[in-house]
């Protein structure tokens, strides 16, 4: 049974992804496990009462066979797990039932991205981008763009990057003052080092943040990677610094995670393109869960509800 289809009182069994596992103790001193179960339709919080193992926090991102009961707590769906074991090699389940995938044609999107990079007029920016694609391309094609807020599915980063580059190419043609090569290069590279920020599960989902991801973040990691690549290719220092600035400033303001504020026309534009694409995906994902003619629940990332009109 898909999580999205579970209703209060339903008994269920099947294969689910284990997320956010924590071992806890009741007030009476009895051990239990709290975790999130996930599949391609959503997630639900669950408890395994009187449980001492073997499953624990080290199994985040793995698949388990589970039987249990769907219920509610204070109006929110949850589940009680009666039986749980890690999936085995010969178990019959489809990864496509468990993992949400970007609604794009992966190969065609990747080919478009490569062709667009080849079209950059500036040879220095083009060289950096092509080398970075060679280094990080495999991860770019697979990983999500975020753990949960937006594009949190396999191929999400590729989709996010490609959509932003299409918009960037349009705006570069609209405003003559914008350096197309710099804008598209910065757009391509802005989230590249999320592959170092995240620890991904064997299924390609974000299990947690890496040590470097927590202490440095993908902006700093990305700027460092570009700096190293620019040095390797003997790119002029100012161009290297401009690319690093694009990455470090793409969150717009320090309160939103930017290391510095945008200080050139291309970095200003990039920060808005990133905001627009992430917001549009947040709206899209939540509208799919909100019946026509009704309001959603409060969306943490937007700090408001949204209305899904006919």
Residue ranges and their predicted role:
Residues 1-12:
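OB-fold nucleic-acid-binding modules
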Residues 16, 61, 164, 247, ...:
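Divalent metal-coordination and catalytic microenvironments
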Residues 21-31, 44-47, 51-96:
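OB-fold single-stranded nucleic acid-binding module
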Residues 34-39, 200:
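Short, acidic/hydrophobic/Gly-rich beta-strand patch recurrent on exposed beta strands
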Residues 78-144, 221:
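Extended, charge-rich, solvent-exposed interface segments
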Residues 125-168, 192-197:
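A short mid-domain helix/strand-loop element embedded in enzyme catalytic domains
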Residues 148-151, 159, 170-290:
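Divalent metal-dependent catalytic cores for phosphoryl transfer on phosphate-bearing substrates
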Residues 271, 288, 293-310:
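N-terminal intrinsically disordered, cationic/polar leader segments
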């Amino acid at each position: 049974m898909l999580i999205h289809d579970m209703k209060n009182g339903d008994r269920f069994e099947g294969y689910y992804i284990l997320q956010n596992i924590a071992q806890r103790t009741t007030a009476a001193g009895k051990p239990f496990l709290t975790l999130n179960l996930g599949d391609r339709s959503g997630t639900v919080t669950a408890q395994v009462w009187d449980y001492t193992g073997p499953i624990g926090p080290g199994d985040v991102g793995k698949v388990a066979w589970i039987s249990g009961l769907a219920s509610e707590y204070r109006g929110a769906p949850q589940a009680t797990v009666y039986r749980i074991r890690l999936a085995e090699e010969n178990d019959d389940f489809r990864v496509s039932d468990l993992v949400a995938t970007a609604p794009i044609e992966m190969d065609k999107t990747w080919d478009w991205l490569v062709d667009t990079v080849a079209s950059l007029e500036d040879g220095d920016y083009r060289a950096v981008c092509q080398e970075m694609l060679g280094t990080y391309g495999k991860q770019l094609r697979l990983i999500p763009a975020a753990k949960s807020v937006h594009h949190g599915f396999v191929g999400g980063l590729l989709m996010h990057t490609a959509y932003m580059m299409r918009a960037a190419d349009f705006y570069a043609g609209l405003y003559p003052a914008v350096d197309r090569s710099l804008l598209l290069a910065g757009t391509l590279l802005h989230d590249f080092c999320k592959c170092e920020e995240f620890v991904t599960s064997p299924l390609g989902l974000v299990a947690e943040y890496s040590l470097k991801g927590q202490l440095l973040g993908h902006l700093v990691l990305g700027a460092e990677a570009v700096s190293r690549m620019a040095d390797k290719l003997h790119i002029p220092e100012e161009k290297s610094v401009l690319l690093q600035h694009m990455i470090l400033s793409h969150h717009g303001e320090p309160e939103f995670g930017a290391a510095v504020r945008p200080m050139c026309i291309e970095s200003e534009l990039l920060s808005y393109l990133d905001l627009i694409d992430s917001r549009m995906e947040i709206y899209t994902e939540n509208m799919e869960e909100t019946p026509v003619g009704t309001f959603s629940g409060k969306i943490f990332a937007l700090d408001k509800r949204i209305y899904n009109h006919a």
